[in-house]
UniProtKB/Swiss-Prot annotation, chain A:
Pathway: Porphyrin-containing compound metabolism; chlorophyll biosynthesis (light-independent). This is Light-independent protochlorophyllide reductase subunit N. Binds 1 [4Fe-4S] cluster per heterodimer. The cluster is bound at the heterodimer interface by residues from both subunits. InterPro entries: LIPOR_BchN/ChlN, Nase/OxRdtase_comp1, Protochl_reductN. Its EC number is 1.3.7.7. Protochlorophyllide reductase is composed of three subunits; ChlL, ChlN and ChlB. Forms a heterotetramer of two ChlB and two ChlN subunits. It catalyses: chlorophyllide a + oxidized 2[4Fe-4S]-[ferredoxin] + 2 ADP + 2 phosphate = protochlorophyllide a + reduced 2[4Fe-4S]-[ferredoxin] + 2 ATP + 2 H2O. NCBIfam families: DPOR_bchN, PRK02842.1. It is an enzyme of class 1 (oxidoreductase).
UniProtKB/Swiss-Prot annotation, chain B:
Substrate binds at G425, L426. Its EC number is 1.3.7.7. The gene is chlB. This is Light-independent protochlorophyllide reductase subunit B. The active site is at D290 (proton donor). Protochlorophyllide reductase is composed of three subunits; ChlL, ChlN and ChlB. Forms a heterotetramer of two ChlB and two ChlN subunits. Coiled coil: none annotated. Pathway: Porphyrin-containing compound metabolism; chlorophyll biosynthesis (light-independent). Component of the dark-operative protochlorophyllide reductase (DPOR) that uses Mg-ATP and reduced ferredoxin to reduce ring D of protochlorophyllide (Pchlide) to form chlorophyllide a (Chlide). This reaction is light-independent. The NB-protein (ChlN-ChlB) is the catalytic component of the complex.
Amino acid sequence: MSKVEFNKETGPREVFCGLTSIVWLHRRMPDAFFLVVGSRTCAHLIQSAAGVMIFAEPRFGTAILEEKDLAGLADAHEELDRVVNDLIARRPEIKTLFLVGSCPSEVIKLDLATVAEKLNKRFLGQVRFVNYSGSGIETTFTQGEDGALKALIPLMESSNEEKLLLVGTLANNVEDRFKKIFKNLGISNIESFPPRQSTELPKIGKNTKVLLTQPYLSDTVRDLKHRGCEIISAPFPLGIEGSTEWFLAAAKAFKINELKVHEILSPLINRAKLALESHKEILKGKRLFLLPESQLEISLARFLHNECEMDLVEVGTPYLNKDLMKEEINLLPDNTKIVEGQHVEKQLDRVRESNPDLVVCGMGLANPLEAEGISTKWSIEMVFSPIHGIDQAADLAGLFSKPLRRNQILTTKTLVTH
Amino acid sequence: MELTLWTYEGPPHVGAMRIASSMKDIHYVLHAPQGDTYADLLFTMIERRGQRPPVTYTTFQARDLGGDTAELVKKNIKEAVERFKPKTLLVGESCTAELIQDQPGALAKGMGFDMPIVNLELPAYSKKENWGASETFYQLTRTLLKEKVSSSEKISPLRWKELGRRPKVNILGPSLLGFRCRDDVIEIQRILSEQGIDTNVVAPLGASPDDIERLIDAEINICLYPEIAEASCEWLKRNFGMEYTNTIPIGIKNTIEFINEVHKKLDLPLTNKEELENKSKLPWYSKSVDSNYLTGKRVFIFGDGTHAIAAAKIAKEELGFEVVGLGTYSREMARQVRATAKDLNVEALITNNYLEVEDAMKKAAPELVLGTQMERHSAKRLGIPCSVISTPMHVQDVPARYSPQMGWEGANVIFDDWVHPLMMGLEEHLIDMFKHDFEFVDGHQSHLGHTATNTNNILNSDEKKEKNSKEGIIWTESGRAELTKVPFFVRGKVKTNTEKYAILRGIPEISDETLYDAKAYFN
Ligand code: SF4
Ligand code: SF4
């Protein structure tokens, strides 16, 4: 391991809770519905985090707890039953219903597992019920996906067929690209988790080789291991380097000759390098500060330093699984400062002190930093845009070069804001 | 339990944040888990604020629950006070903290600070955002003024005469995340000053705790947004005898009535009525021959109580529309909305459920919808033009230009905002004529005709083009499949670039690889 400096920080945070993952999970699995059992705050959060970009009736909703539900848990169970019945009557196309726990439902100890079990019996053959927690007292932002996937694992049948399982939500076009490249490498039995339909869960077993596409799936990985799956250790497929290593690790697990991998990837790599040039020109030598949000920060820092030549001031991450991030951390430059957790005020003090060229942060902080003359990039864009893979390296770099380019066009640094 | 897919109002502590963020020298310590910090983005993104809301979240986690969350609260209060040095501290809790009963307000009061502390108890499981804002403003006013209650005598609206100065009023209720509050305040202040009336304090927007203590220097209060200010106005009336106004100056008629009301209360002579009527273009624009086509247009109205009622009146009396639906999500204003609806012969819709609103909208089959951000979506789905008149709103409803809803200029803005979507009839025509043109890929539609059929037409014509490119270049299956994955708003550009690239390189067939090659080439 390189001489990375690990720090831990606690204090007031500025991070979404795990409920936010619903925003991309419901798009991935259009036959699923996410029912948050929570408060008006939870409802307001997903609506605000999803932007106000809801075009059709959304496939998520909140069963808002009211005074009378708090009084007696028995009533709360009955009420939830009623809400679920109404919902299913209204949306007969739902195949999987996720009951999503929140802070309030956890604090009052509403047992969603039991509710799900009962409902499973009642709606047998029609709708499947699973539960997980996306609460902010337990999970941040992307960890909601970890919870949702982990909850699906018990539903996955066993099979000893040899296969490659890509784990973590990807944009569809990226996923298609990956599958095509793997096929060219000679790995043809590839499945994705989560799948595009919640009912088409992959079968898993001791010949399943798991390749993670996202770094925030600690619990899911643990449970897949328990089911006998082999976890392929690799950096994450962000940037040319990460993606190449990622393909190589998979090839190795399938005993495919390394030369063949290089042969197939090298035209892609060359073209990606070419595409990366113009962004690198802008990013080179610029100082980057990543505030914790998505757990993608370490991979992004690695890409932006190693391939775009940015200098890393600080790399924040809401949670650090050193085991899963081992390969990534190995690739980081010496003396990288990693900070796990957050004390947002102290962190902002450090931002101001170090005066970086670009800060990656949550949506609540971006405009205030811009107003202070510091360019920013929303971290939430990383989970909404197709950024994985060699072909997307330049697009990924573009997400960071754009604010800087914009800054060059608009020369005014500090503005009066209203 | 209430099933919600979309909510019009946030929780009550978001209302409290609206008050805190609107003011100066105030800090709000909110006992809440980390995820509740999302609320900051309402201010920094929808309102494009350049400052963070003055809120410190205690960010308690599950592992803190077994231990001493009260200690965590105290630590955060101490840090916040040291760092931000507020003149007044608000302390409260969000829905989750309410359940663990740490009573942060009481804790703060026991910490020996010398600034006023307002302990906010906002029941999260029965109340909502506007109520929370109103309660916070009320508690703040009470806390800062309660010592002056006994010593002061009742304030006469005519006091200005005794004191030999111009009359002074307070403008109460405007807040961040309110609909166009910033500009309304400017407009109302301008109107009052033209009438010889000075503004003493505007609150909460832009006020400090010191300003709240100065409220009683004015003769009367202007209750500009009753959802937020009425409780405070009532308290000031009860304790200091301060009168407050009831008319909301939205639309020409209401603005004139408002001016009359203020004048009557202050015993001022009124400016000539005709002159007032000519202060806005709305009456003439509405009367001009071009507006003939507005006659009897059917409108459906839904929003907060204040804006919905005002909109109904303007629609009917000032634009000559027919109101075919009227409703609100503000239960506190249900009575008034019902009364207005009755006058218009429609049944008031009081609901929190946007799907119910959409159903009612569908049934009423209006030609124009005046609603919130959610009705904008519903209307779009139904292919009906829409203008947003109330919160909740979208970032595009916080325009850079001066665009109040109140007063003379407000009436001008309303005329434009409501009528422009209707005039797009001509534009729709043109789009239909030119839809086979290359420019009109599926992203380039008018904001109105977002209907499914429309999109399909465009997709089909797009597809045809893909098969026969002019230069005889063939798009292979994989190439075409890849192209459809490109977001519609750049698809046209990607397509042209790829073909350009193919011609340049003498590639006869475009595959997915060609597309990526071209992408890299033009990057
Ligand atoms: S569809 Fe239009 S109005 Fe609706 S959120 Fe998107 S940009 Fe705003
Ligand atoms: S942090 Fe907890 S209470 Fe807040 S929105 Fe998330 S789950 Fe709901």
